[in-house]
């Protein structure tokens, strides 16, 4: 699917040939004398159309319009939130087999973030999972044209939005795949494909190299599976070599049974999504490859399965992490923090400016925040503010949670330096306190995406969050935001 940005007035859009023309109608719409403006004005006057976000009126083959179908779509204040809400009401149309070319025209100048919201809504709404289906219909939508009053002024936001959409889709695709189609080795192979882009490098370590590094916690989780672990190291080099990188660490449990502390059978299939953090790191690098910001980024993915087996780690076992600290594993289903702690220790070798880990870590975070906001834990106030701001701008919000030292009391162990769990109370916080022991003085943040990485029910599937948040954060840190595409075409291709 290709996205295209054009300078297109409401009057000119009437001559644009497409299967679906969407006219976003904001509050205070001022009609001109052209056919579409007249149509909007009449619909508003007769009460057939409201400007409330998501209210719409459909017309088929109206006179004087080249599009086969026209949708007049209310978008309220026309800000990012209102445009997203409006576009979600239209989402089913983007999967219709007859809709191959869509034009989306803003009735007035688009507010900051509105173009990004529109691009993301179309990309998300038209996404079709086909990887393991033999008769699945592929995505029908081939081209999306965004018409704005001034394409040149909108170009930076458009470039970011299309790159983020591609990254989100890459993350969704890998998080959606069944565990036998997304083993640690296959996830590592997906990371290697990103190295074809300029500025991106990939290195993959196997069990022998990980053992040599002394990653006893990571090895302990993986030892119950026949699938060999992989430690993926992605690098994006967009700035001077002397510039300290931001390190992203994504939890990559490609299937989580809970190990010996076995999970209930109901909905265990959803544990293929336990590599949502890893998928988000892949998605971020997919977006960075397009945007090429002036920043250095390292992505680490400790990938393995957590399986019950005669070789599996047992409750009560004590292991030595890469940091040298010993851990009593009271619950083998608290495995994500075990693979992350060694990856966080490994991250120190890059002398990072900041470290952000991303993990579907705790059910407690789902209880606390639901599926709207990711949980944010941070050792540094400035880093926390930067991530909160980026999440708001990207419509991928998070919420800062506490990290008081007293929460770590429950991690005390009689047989090791610490236990891997501290009881049910404050479970998401105690998990973050566990991770904090492995980051030293480096500014560090932990995003618990257990409630936001996927959704259940009829629309079960990965969301691709928090790719948008992370990309916006990295762009904010970069000295040069993007390399502009050729002005002539103003088009971007997303992941198909």
Swiss-Prot record:
GO cellular component, one term: cytoplasm
Required cofactor(s): Mn(2+)
EC number assigned by the record: 3.4.11.1, 3.4.11.10
Record keywords: Aminopeptidase, Cytoplasm, Hydrolase, Manganese, Metal-binding, Protease
Gene3D superfamilies named among the record's database cross-references: Leucine Aminopeptidase, subunit E, domain 1, Zn peptidases
Cofactor comment: Binds 2 manganese ions per subunit.
Coiled-coil portions: none
Subcellular location: Cytoplasm
Catalytic residues identified in the record: 263, 337
Enzyme class: hydrolase
Gene Ontology molecular function, alphabetical: manganese ion binding; metalloaminopeptidase activity
Catalytic activities: Release of an N-terminal amino acid, Xaa-|-Yaa-, in which Xaa is preferably Leu, but may be other amino acids including Pro although not Arg or Lys, and Yaa may be Pro. Amino acid amides and methyl esters are also readily hydrolyzed, but rates on arylamides are exceedingly low; Release of an N-terminal amino acid, preferentially leucine, but not glutamic or aspartic acids
GO biological-process terms attached to the record: proteolysis
Family: Belongs to the peptidase M17 family.
Function of the molecule: Presumably involved in the processing and regular turnover of intracellular proteins. Catalyzes the removal of unsubstituted N-terminal amino acids from various peptides.
NCBIfam families, alphabetized: PRK00913.1-4, PRK00913.2-4
Designated name of the protein: Probable cytosol aminopeptidase
Higher taxonomy: Bacteria, Pseudomonadati, Pseudomonadota, Betaproteobacteria, Burkholderiales
Gene that produces this protein: pepA
